[in-house]
Amino acid sequence: MMAVASSRTPAVTSFIAPLVAMVGGGQLARMTHQAAIALGQNLRVLVTSADDPAAQVTPNVVIGSHTDLAALRRVAAGADVLTFDHEHVPNELLEKLVADGVNVAPSPQALVHAQDKLVMRQRLAAAGVAVPRYAGIKDPDEIDVFAARVDAPIVVKAVRGGYDGRGVRMARDVADARDFARECLADGVAVLVEERVDLRRELSALVARSPFGQGAAWPVVQTVQRDGTCVLVIAPAPALPDDLATAAQRLALQLADELGVVGVLAVELFETTDGALLVNELAMRPHNSGHWTIDGARTSQFEQHLRAVLDYPLGDSDAVVPVTVMANVLGAAQPPAMSVDERLHHLFARMPDARVHLYGKAERPGRKVGHINFLGSDVAQLCERAELAAHWLSHGRWTDGWDPHRASDDAVGVPPACGGRSDEEERRL
């Protein structure tokens, strides 16, 4: 009997990509979009301008303000979840979105601990978590009482909105602290005052948590600050005792669980000179201290954030190499005449292993316009190369006087450990 071909068309299974809405169009949203592409997801972003970093790369854009409820509703419409590139959305607007049925991650109840430093300090202190000694200030004269009590240098901080050293005054004396507090209060900005910690260094413990309650922790890193801005991240933190690293990871996972965080949580820490850990700040989103994970970890913070807010199983957060160093590229006081593209060309000629991530932002003094990752095993060498590369991209000038026209292996920056010639070998040639 002859077989007869079926005339029926095989069923086609359509794929509907999960839609994640993100408030904010900066570099964090831009890099989250890059992670979403690999996962087959659709990221919609709320931006203030079509020139914002994320708007340059994603086609799904809503232009509007994060303080406009109508704009927030537009970006959230039909999304599986709404998450954040920054913490500046007014909490009362997020509560209205939740009432509309929007899945907001992290929730407004969790996010307030990253928005309001005083609320965060009070919650953590009540839970027995070590924080610097602090006080909320309603009258500048209250600073005198606090300063007398702690008998230490003091710092005045805006309760909301400060970042990268903004909204923070490392007071010279009590009078300076009073003046800054008076300025803030006159502008309607609430302030707190805290002791200036005698610290060894600053650390960051980065974790992620899903609605299911699964947690994942990356290695604890050291952050290097200059003028209030992070310039370097070393992963893992050099010479950090295992017990202290484990304690920092456990603390971050505990805070994520107790605060109900969904997504990435960065816990900024002070390591004191006597080996204690104090919580400085919280961020409930991908964080500058986690940019190393793009190249240096099995799962980047951006992919992990997407996994977490969509309640996927979380990825492996282990490092892929012994050491990764990340250097921020900051806008120079005087932008160089050489184009960014030409600077990039010269950088790759000298350092072909540099992992460059540029944000599509106009160069302005001190502005974060990109970052560079270097992977390897020698901390000192990686830090040196990262700082050289970042300064070159910022200023168009090599701080070590390197000559791109010198014909040697050094022209491509191959260190001896990677097969390049040592200085002694060069002298023998």
UniProtKB/Swiss-Prot annotation:
Q: Which UniProt keywords apply?
A: ATP-binding, Ligase, Nucleotide-binding, Purine biosynthesis
One biological process term in Gene Ontology: 'de novo' IMP biosynthetic process
Domain ATP-grasp stretches: 121-310
> What top-level branch of life does the organism fall under?
Bacteria
Instruction: Report the GO molecular function annotations.
Output: 5-(carboxyamino)imidazole ribonucleotide synthase activity; ATP binding; metal ion binding; phosphoribosylaminoimidazole carboxylase activity
Ranges for the region named Disordered are 406-429
What Gene Ontology terms describe where this protein resides (cellular component)? cytosol; plasma membrane
Please indicate if the UniProt record lists ATP-binding as a keyword. yes
Which positions does UniProt annotate for ATP binding? 117, 157, 194-197, 202, 280-281
TM regions (residue ranges)? none
Asked if Nucleotide-binding is a keyword of the record, the answer is yes
The protein's annotated pathway: Purine metabolism; IMP biosynthesis via de novo pathway; 5-amino-1-(5-phospho-D-ribosyl)imidazole-4-carboxylate from 5-amino-1-(5-phospho-D-ribosyl)imidazole (N5-CAIR route): step 1/2
- A Pfam family annotated for this UniProt entry: ATP-grasp
| Recorded catalytic activity of this chain's protein | 5-amino-1-(5-phospho-beta-D-ribosyl)imidazole + hydrogencarbonate + ATP = 5-carboxyamino-1-(5-phospho-D-ribosyl)imidazole + ADP + phosphate + 2 H(+)
Q: What is its EC number?
A: 6.3.4.18
What is this protein for, i.e. what is its function?
Catalyzes the ATP-dependent conversion of 5-aminoimidazole ribonucleotide (AIR) and HCO(3)(-) to N5-carboxyaminoimidazole ribonucleotide (N5-CAIR).
Q: Oligomeric state and partners?
A: Homodimer.
Give the family this protein belongs to, as stated in its UniProt record: Belongs to the PurK/PurT family.
Q: Beyond the main fields, what else does the record say?
A: Was identified as a high-confidence drug target.
> What is the designated name of this protein?
N5-carboxyaminoimidazole ribonucleotide synthase
The species is: Mycobacterium tuberculosis (strain ATCC 25618 / H37Rv)
